[in-house]
């Protein structure tokens, strides 16, 4: 399958590597805007001769290569426009580190721990105009210790699960065996990010007010050696 990946860091790299090694044609990638330190996903793409088409912040449908069949969002933290999604035969999918519709938003792992959930997991869902609100293709559940774990420990558990789920989802889509399930809005929650800016929507006229409120910031982790989604020094 011809796949375009929007992602970043270790998770984006792991998803890119898995799909590339499974024989899929990667038509391009879109990482976040690059700073002094090169993103790990970008480094792997350059090693394999995969084109960095645009950064996520400026991605529009014109930048999606012709013939792309599927967009995969792998820890991108950017809204992908509906025009980009519509350009692809199978649209787009994303991995979210919670059991949607619970904990929509950019900091699902942190909020899972903060709210003392005993159950978490991962979701593969259809990308669309609603943040983390698309139909569900796959879900995996895990039990957690909300009083003994921190967000890093939960993410370390969900990381490999997420990579496996993306791989499985692509195979399901390729085989035409998709069964999509709508999210039950009765149980939906949306929490704001602790540290990240509000989502930017390219190619979309935004009407109405903001959906995010201010939240107090967690202290930066000083012990974590993992290239995770929480440590500013690894961004």
Outline where the language-model segments fall.
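One-carbon transfer enzymes
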Residues: 1-235
